[in-house]
Every structure is written in C-alpha cells, then in structure tokens.
Amino acid sequence: MTISKRDNVCLQAAGLATATTAAQVRTVNAIGYTINGRTYAKAATDNLWAPAGAVMAAGEVQVIWLYLNAAGTASVEASAVKKASTTTSTTERYTGGAFDWPDPVDKCCVGAMVITATGAFTPGTTSTATQCVFVNAGPDYGAPITY
C-alpha cells in the first residue's frame, strides 16, 4: 500500500496564529489528525512551532510547513526562498507562483506560515505577526498556496 498526503491529514483547522513568544506559532483550536491510518489529537497549544528557514530580504517569499508527529511533537520544514517583484510597473509586474502542499511521511502537515518579506526576516527570531500569513490545512489540502 502506498501512503500519500491524503493518509496523513489534519481533520480540523488548527487556528494557526502568532504565539505568546512572537517569533513562534500556536494553535488556537484543538485538532484531530491522522498518520498512517491512525487518528491522534492535540490540544490547543501556545509556542508550539519555532520556525526555522533562510534569512530573507525584502521582496522574498518562503513557506514554512508546520508538522505534528504521532507523539504530538512539532517540527517544521522550509521551502526554497523565491523572489517576488517589488516593481509597480504593470508591464514588469511579477506573475505570482505557488507552493505545492508537502507529502510528509510519518507526520501530518497542520498548516503553513507564508512569509512575504517587506524587510529583513529571520524565521524563529522575527515576529510572525507582521510579515506572515497562516494557512490552515483541513480535511483536503486543496489548491497550492499562491503568492
């Protein structure tokens, strides 16, 4: 049997948000999730994920995927940094791209933190409150995350 991301899913929106420690991420809601056909639960938790990724400059975009394993332990995975245009010219304007949802093994993707840097941004150090958008995974990952 082949396991795919549809077998490791988050069953409810976690309500991802900036944590009390402003450079971290929390869940506002309790969630259920599955890994390899088994169901697990995680209570709403503050300071759950400490983002890690590349230091970014203004005009760069990166996604940090937020995972839980069967023990409820949090981990992260950063995408490659992509460039976004800062031009206002309609003829040179950047056409947005997309990040595909990951296909994790032995863990569940609870959501993503999309960073669109308007200035220097260091994951795990810079507050997630200003340059980040949280995307909650649900029963079906659906369309790629666009930027």
Give each language-model segment a name:
Residues 1-147:
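Beta-strand-rich solenoidal segments
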